[in-house]
Curated annotation (Swiss-Prot):
Compositional bias of kind Polar residues: 97-108
Subunit-level organization: Binds NEDD4. Binds BCL3 and CREBBP.
Alphabetical UniProt keywords: ATP-binding, Coiled coil, Cytoplasm, Hydrolase, Nucleotide-binding, Phosphoprotein, Ubl conjugation
Domain Smr: 1691-1770
Subcellular location: Cytoplasm
Protein name: NEDD4-binding protein 2
Lineage: Eukaryota, Metazoa, Chordata, Craniata, Vertebrata
Entry comment on modification after translation: Ubiquitinated; this targets the protein for degradation by the proteasome.
Amino acid sequence: MPRRRKNLGGNPFRKTANPKEVVVSSVASREEPTTTLPSMGETKVDQEELFTSISEIFSDLDPDVVYLMLSECDFKVENAMDCLLELSATDTKIEESSSQSFVASENQVGAAESKIMEKRPEEESEDSKMDSFLDMQLTEDLDSLIQNAFEKLNSSPDDQVYSFLPSQDVNSFNDSSEFINPDSSNMTPIFSTQNMNLNGENLENSGSTLSLNPLPSHSVLNESKCFIKDNTLALESNYPEDSLLSSSLNVASDSIAGCSSLNQKQKELLESECVEAQFSEAPVDLDASEPQACLNLPGLDLPGTGGDQKSTRVSDVFLPSEGFNFKPHKHPELPTKGKDVSYCPVLAPLPLLLPPPPPPPMWNPMIPAFDLFQGNHGFVAPVVTTAAHWRSVNYTFPPSVISHTSPTKVWRNKDGTSAYQVQETPVSQVVRKKTSYVGLVLVLLRGLPGSGKSFLARTLQEDNPSGVILSTDDYFYINGQYQFDVKYLGEAHEWNQNRAKEAFEKKISPIIIDNTNLQAWEMKPYVALSQKHKYKVLFREPDTWWKFKPKELARRNIHGVSKEKITRMLEHYQRFVSVPIIMSSSVPEKIERIELCAYSCEDRSTSPRDDEDIISEKEENILSLSLKHLEFTEEKNLDVTKETMLPENVAYLSNADLNKRRKEISDMNPSIQSALILETPHMYFSDSESKLQATDKSENEQIEMVAVKGYSKTDTDSSMERVSPSTCCSENNQEDCDLANSGPLQNEKSSPGEIVEERATVTKKAFGKQKSKSTLEKFPRHELSNFVGDWPVDKTIGQRTKRNRKTEKTSSVQSDKKYNYPQSHKLVNSVSVNTDCVQQRGSPHESVEDGRKSQCDDASEPLNSYKYDAYKNIDKNSFNIMGDWPSSDSLAQREHRSRMPKTGLSEPNLEIGTNDKMNEISLSTAHEACWGTSSQKLKTLGSSNLGSSEMLLSEMTCESQTCLSKKSHGQHTSLPLTFTNSAPTVSGVVEPQTLAECQEQMPKRDPGKEVGMCTQTEPQDFALLWKIEKNKISISDSIKVLTGRLDGFKPKVFNINTKSDVQEAIPYRVMYDKSTFVEESELTSADESENLNILCKLFGSFSLEALKDLYERCNKDIIWATSLLLDSETKLCEDTEFENFQKSCDGSQIGPFSLGLNLKEIISQRGTLENSNSPVPEFSHGIGISNADSQSTCDAERGNSEQAEMRAVTPENHESMTSIFPSAAVGLKNNNDILPNSQEELLYSSKQSFPGILKATTPKDMSETEKNLVVTETGDNIHSPSHFSDIFNFVSSTSNLELNEEIYFTDSLEIKRNENFPKDYVKFSDEEEFMNEDEKEMKEILMAGSSLSAGVSGEDKTEILNPTPAMAKSLTIDCLELALPPELAFQLNELFGPVGIDSGSLTVEDCVVHIDLNLAKVIHEKWKESVMERQRQEEVSCGKFMQDPSLVGHTGLDNPEQKSSQRTGKKLLKTLTASEMLPLLDHWNTQTKKVSLREIMSEEIALQEKHNLKRETLMFEKDCATKLKEKQLFKIFPAINQNFLVDIFKDHNYSLEHTVQFLNCVLEGDPVKTVVAQEFVHQNENVTSHTGQKSKEKKPKKLKETEETPSELSFQDFEYPDYDDYRAEAFLHQQKRMECYSKAKEAYRIGKKNVATFYAQQGTLHEQKMKEANHLAAIEIFEKVNASLLPQNVLDLHGLHVDEALEHLMRVLEKKTEEFKQNGGKPYLSVITGRGNHSQGGVARIKPAVIKYLISHSFRFSEIKPGCLKVMLK
């Protein structure tokens, strides 16, 4: 068969580090050569014949090896022969080098028995043995074999042992015998101080321990040829430096990891590992194991485990990727000893990173010189563990560190035979051109996982020893094991970029970036650095035939990336990149990034353990970390506890296990210990659960991932989340987990056990994060790295947010430090701070806000409370937060706050009573909720820490405030999410004032007043909670437990008499019971119905249908929906109402306020209120803590974050609250009077917030409210009656928030309001009937929202309180006051002239217009029409729209309400300065009114479509140029389906030239044809047709040329004017000739011979001219068409006559042959002859002539495609 072109990209050409080192893939036994490489070899008859013949030629080589070589070379004889010749030569040398033996550790097969140097007659039998071993589990024979091998090794002199690595790197094994199987214990292998080369990977002993056979270094690693046969690594000892002993072959072990220079210690480790391996004898098919990422099977408690735990160094264990072959079949699990050795289930030998010490003098270029952040290096043996061993890994031991910078790809066959395709360098060819780079060069390797990038990188580094290989994968090598964690992708990329930056600064060259670099943006950081440092940028892709074959890539990549993942990555692969493209690229969409994110993500999924292992390894590092990173500590703790603490054999943690784990933890670093211990119980719970159960484990991973995501989510939303190490961790984890699972709701639901588990999860996360870095360090890094393609995006945001938290945490920690808090205290403190966070976490969105707020609030609450004398109560409560840990009261409130968001999220939260008693309870509950600690305990703990906590509090408050300030800025991002919080919170960002106030007030705090904070939650607390939950403890009155319910918080009073039976059956592993507080079904329903209610309440301007549609489009993700709405500048109804109301209240009562500040203050006060004992807190219906009512209120509040805030208002806090929530604390100057007012207002606000709630007070009111309320909320916020009814129902279920509020006001405040208040109160009962005009007005104003005037007097507030009553009263009102929004007033001024007031001096009062009922009715009708139109998605004219919204704002209520609102608005306006009110109203009106939900939705849909399109096109957006090119392409190929053309165009990366060239090549001619040519061809005779054909061919060729020649693309329409001219001339002469001949014929016919002769001569002349013209045209065509093709060894003969084509062919062939002989290059010439489509009759003429010529001149050629011949140059 014709010789196929050498596969330059094939492995055969890849050279191993040692050119003489031949890596022979171990193949399954000769018996199954084909199966061995099913994917590689084509089982064709000719291939079999070839195999047979070559096997005969190389009889000394194992047929498996021969087959492998053939398959690797694609059965190309020339390629295979080179490799086989080299192998045979190597084999001979091996035999000769008997004096030199390599240390070969042959685990499973006694292949080592015979040294390769020795040829043994038993080879055949050994081969069969090995095959059998490969195919079956290893048996005890292995032990004897190993012994024999060791004996041989022992016989070898020490001096022969050669170590590639300096002895310093080698840990000498103290007891080689240990390492050796007990059977072989009698043997003492010679381990010289010199490094012995172990085939570490061979450690996979099924039943036998690794046997280290120290063969002389120069001897081939494995036995004789048979060994080579089976194991594909024959290293020539001649080049010890190059020979990778490390790549010694394990005959039996499918993966051979050459452990070059292992110490005895290492050997011991190996021994122990082997011993451990013995325990897991089940052979595992690589296929099965491959998908799993390298697992660290660290510390199975196996006898071997007790051995030396020193992790072998990477240098000690040197694993060249090339040298590994493994037979996937049989990898018994080798438990790593104490994690000293990490096993890669993938069984892919992983190259080890050299240790930090300077690379050994004879370092192998194959091994990256970079050291991981961890110094320990361990021996890696691929291990496939049985399921049982899977879990029972003991994490107590520090993981061994083996750094594989570039793990080799896993080569495995489906049948488990070692279809050993040496991925990276199966066989090194004798001749390989060295690629040396001159100058400063940056080499960016690009390729999919498994394509050979790492090998190429090592090869380049070998050729350029001064170069350095930088791979992001290095980041994930912990203890020598590749442990990918997507959470750290961004961090890893950033880390790698920092390394690259250092390399650039050091002028290292070449700098080889060994990343996938799928897309341009991924390379941008490196290219930018190269540009900065004047480096030349080279892009290199592995020249492997499988680089774009997902199946083969999946088989070859060492990280177990699945085919599907690789396929997705391939879809995103940007094939054409250049520096300009890269520099102009931008980071893609998150999702895409995540998709593009390192394939290794799948590695995680492959082995549930990876995370844990990673964590466990991290744990080592983490353990060393101090708890100052509480968050991490906690997470670590979880991880540690989970991984480290869980004994391998612990299926379920018993108390003993817990203790044991504790001990283990104690073994860990004390610092972590403390954290762990704190968390341990929790961890135990979570650990035992998650860890012990695979599902749990996977869940944990998920949780981790989710948690990470959650964090990213939550973090994004709340930086605080992570700040609270334990609390946040616990809740967050849980929440994160929940987020992953059931959503944030579960956090609240989660029992302490849950929390613990969460915490554990978080801890785990933290651990995962803390590979070697402190959380704080890493998080910033995360923030820094917003990488996405290879790194997840979610996290970045979360981390960024988190960074703020960290700041908080840091501050808290610092404060802790200042006060020398024990770490546990720190935890508590951070937790307390985090409590907010945690609570916040409850609703990630809000949590950030709350966290910040809560901190600020904590500070501000005291401030406010101080300001307001309520400060005493509040102070007490708010300062309860003192040491980072809020005191019970503040905690309760704060928790509520945070929880409120959660509730908003429809997560039921334990709402704690506002009273001190309640606070206490709430504290306990809150603590329990957060910590699962009983309130009593918390108190006790807190009390112990009280003083310090106070100090901390002040300090921390300041710090937290600072953080808050920071966060407040950052808060905006999370605000949209926090919509669940009161809208005002969202709208208001904490302003520096708040901080200042907090700080100012801080001093005011009276530590004595504060409640003690608990620093630590004890397991008993969780147990107590658990028992309470399980009703196992009799309930005492001392504890009041509020259980969150969707239908409202109804306090479940547990009279907890902590009996002695408290200890009864306290599960030490408190499990996370998802249904602890709320059933999942409830959660689900809560999510949907609650979230919809929340959305409707928050965004009343949109119809329920629209919101529901948006909610569904957002996959029922309320956070997403809310974010969309907020991002679209839609303000929350509550927000607007509250703002307006607040303005009014503040204006009248408090005066101007900065909404953001006030919001925070209010929030803090809200917390304070809740905390404060004053009945007012009860009033805080929003808090819903005080009573069942309050709970219901809470629910309502949930519905309305506003309510939550309103509830926060207390008489004391009221003012601050007012500032925050106008509605919440409608500026109550007099706590009593104002409070009633504020309460009313709050109620009103609540009502507003809850349009439905307002009316919910009474069913009648509800119905009416529905009518009115549809408009009530914010003018724009129009709730459909159904929505309101829902709200009302919700309110009712919550025991009618308003009623509750009213009750609260009445009860707690004893609403001492003006007579109005009682009225209002009564009105609460019957709002409609009792409402005053003022009240109505206020309601109107509030409801109007946009028209709301800033100041509302108590009356007004009262009015506001009763919007519906306003309607009832409206019947008796003759006229109404309409408060015009400033915008509308200005517009009216402009449109219809001035009204006698200077627009500049316009005040709120001036904007009040008295309108009669008729006009009001007209306005109402118009308003209604506008609403209907909006709902119909019909845009109203701008003017009308402006008016309507204002009308909506003002007339939103009934006319009477409008009137009252006018009055109220007047009052408010009066109170507030116009400037203050106007901007707010302006801002509000502008944002809210001008954006409709439909617009937002349409935008979002369009945006989503755009993103989807981007995703589809790999982030490629069609710009104008691309579209023009596309159109041009359609013109060029009009006959081809445009969709097909678009696909082709896309496949060619939107390169018109390439696309056209490809299509021309495929079509063999241009679709465009010259009509004239065709006509002439058809008209004329053969000559004419021939000429026409030529010209036709020429023209098509020109067109094709045009298409093919990029430079000429612009002239496609008129590219060959000369050609056209020539052809026209030829045609003209042809016509003339035909005319002359016809005339001559006619003259001859009539007898005029002279005339006939003349015409004949003329015709002849014309024919000559025609030929000349055609010749010129042909020359022109040839030159133009082939100008760009000839350099590429392509000859296009289109458009030429046969003779011309042959002439050019001869000339070009001769020229190219000479060039090839002199300069090399392509050994072939592609000749495009065309298929004859343009020839007359469609019959090809050039092609047959060319073929005939080639045959006659003995050229070898093949027709690669129709019309294209590939001619091999001689």
